[in-house]
Amino acid sequence: MLIDGNCHTVVQSHNKRNFDYCLHNQTEMFIFASKTDISMNSKITVAALMATTLTIGGCKTQESNMTTAGEAGHTNALLEKSKNIHGIESFDKLTVDDYREAILEGVGEQKKNVETIAGNKAKPTFQNTIAALDRSGEALNRASATFWPLSSSNSTPEFRALDKELSPILSAHSDDIYMNDKLFERVKAVYDEADSTSLSKEEMKVTENIYKRFERNGANLSDEDKEKLRQLNLEISDLQVQFSQNLLHETNNTFVTVDKLEDLQGLPQSDIDRAAAMAAAQGQTGKWMFNMQRASCNPVLQYCSNRELRRKIYQAYCNRGNQDNDYDSKEICAKLVKLRLERAKLMGFKNCASQILDTRMAKTPEAVYALLDQVWTPAVAKANEELEDIRTEMKKDGLDCEPEGWDYRYYLERARKAKFNFDESKLSEYLEINNVLKGVFYVANKLYGVSFKEITDKAPAYEPTAQAWEVYDADSTLLAIFYSDYMPRDGKRAGAWCTSFRGQRYDGGSRVEPVVVNVCSMTPPSADKPALQTIDNVETMFHEFGHALHSFMRDVHYSSVANVERDFVELPSQINEHWAFEPQVLDVYAKHYVTGEKLPQELLDKYIAASKYGQGFATVEYLAASYSDMDLHVLTEVPDDLDVMKFEEEKLRQRGIPRQIQPRYRITNFSHTMGGGYTAGYYSYLWAEVLDADGFEAFKETGDIFNQEVASRFRKYVLTPGGIDDGMTMYRNFRGAEPKIDALLKNRGLAE
């Protein structure tokens, strides 16, 4: 597999309701950063791949379930053909040293592949040059596709040390390929003659993609500029790894401790129990502790009446990476902005955003700002309406002061209860995680005819709580292998994402099924209750499974056309969220965890009435982060004394952001943009939401949300082709027209 420094592997995800963090990226090794397979399998540069996956950095030591190198009879399973069911790797038998050995051997093997292709004396053809490059590096891909996902979900100090060790090696390896003059001459020769050959549409696209990838990675630069680019790539890769590891440490090792139970008034008992367990794990039995994982701190911000505790947690969360300690990332962020601009200018672009967007649907920063601006004004107006409701609720508590950031979620939840008599915790009693997963599978079956057979007891396990399924198509052929990894743990970075241990490919004319995993940190079971989920968590499960469906159904012969544009990749995931709370879907999975009773119509009606409340806040905090991402990367000059926090604050103040709302991620904890993967790309969730909102209308217009003709078109034109066509072409093929923003604004309650 050819690597491309401009691609990623984890798909950083979110759900539309709160634009939450779910990593996604693209490629066979990607994590989509989602999320290895952002619903794309493509060639990515190992270095970028790393940086993206590492976007999350370090955390506390956890016990490893891996064997220790040097044990009697130990062999490196990555260097042997897997004998497991469906050729899945033996995760439990691999050591960190095994990964190092296999990845380095893979680098050596790909170097030989490339030397052979570049030194071929025969006339350059698609088969002996383009296809050969596309196939190169299979051993490296196999090892990387196992290591990178586990470095995000099962990280240990040893994993993180290997991350840092491999980063410069893989960055240099990528540069060696794309700056190989003889190799580029052969690629260019095939590209220049492509129109006069009998190549298929897919082969033409592969040729174009590989040629342009060489261009984007410096093949046309002078020797002097190539050396500059190499150095920039190394520095950027290293800084992204540092940022990611700082953030992981700050997220998992920043604690707020509570000594008295009465200080947790209003917090659901299940969250109190988890805080007690966290404290006990930290040697603080009898106390309650919260770290900066959203599953830990969000319930406090939403339900706890203790204003001082909310303040402490809110500020600790917002200030991750901005505490002037050993894990402070302000200087790292400033350096990244500066180096990315240098690299963009070296490649002939006026700024970093222009360089990145050149290969996206949006094409230009101006198009991105036009979309953000179109939503910003109604979103701020709605947020200001919500602030009035918050002030009203605060006065009931005798607080005649202006709301602060730590008041927003708590009083907004109270206002929602007052307006709609809706209590989300009551709905959660019907959202047990195994039942929700049945609902996820039900939707996939109704839309596409796929079915699932659990093989957890047969498939190799990389984590005891993970489950595995065979996924069968409507004609009973094996389509994919699916792993679900939903429980939080030390060593798992924050958020949710989709990745692949093996991307879809062909071997000797036969389709090889992908091995896809959804990774999340959902609400775990408590002492007396099963794993009951929030609305956001349910939407996240549907979201990540939408990415998984994209990976299951992709059917391409060359990995260089597996990826889609970053601002298109969220369409399959976000459209899948639309079915989560449809009444006929809820009827299948929403059952009370004690009685088995189906969700009462009265509670469903209250949820529907309240579902759009709070969208001003949710939309503004997302847009604020998107603006910050773009504002930093459209700079054409970066001052040596750039203070990224002051820059962010001033830009948002000029736009009129309500004082009580912070960006969803402050710059020093904004892994999407600073960790790589979604640099100048956080807007893509909104871009894709225009597509998914308009796309779901295609189902609704028929009067049947499971309309088979529409579902068949979506699969044929969106899920299956990979990146053979550009995103807008695929969307038009599906919908018959370009998307309109109307449905998005209506869905968010920002328009009538």
Q: How should each PLM-predicted stretch be described?
A:
Residues 9-14, 18-24, 29-31, 36:
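Short, positively charged and aromatic/hydrophobic N-terminal segments
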Residues 17, 65-268:
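N-terminal helix-rich structural modules
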Residues 37-46:
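Bacterial N-terminal signal peptides that target proteins for export
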Residues 55-58:
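C-terminal motif of bacterial Sec signal peptides marking the signal peptidase cleavage site
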Residues 68-93, 287, 435, 439-453, ...:
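C-terminal, non-catalytic "cap/extension" segments appended to globular domains
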Residues 83-98, 147-166, 189-231, 291-331, ...:
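Short His/Asp/Glu-rich catalytic/ion-coordination signatures at enzyme active sites or charged loops
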Residues 202, 206, 238, 245, ...:
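Active-site-proximal, well-structured secondary-structure segments within enzyme catalytic domains
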Residues 523-541:
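Short pre-active-site segment immediately N-terminal to the catalytic Zn-binding motif
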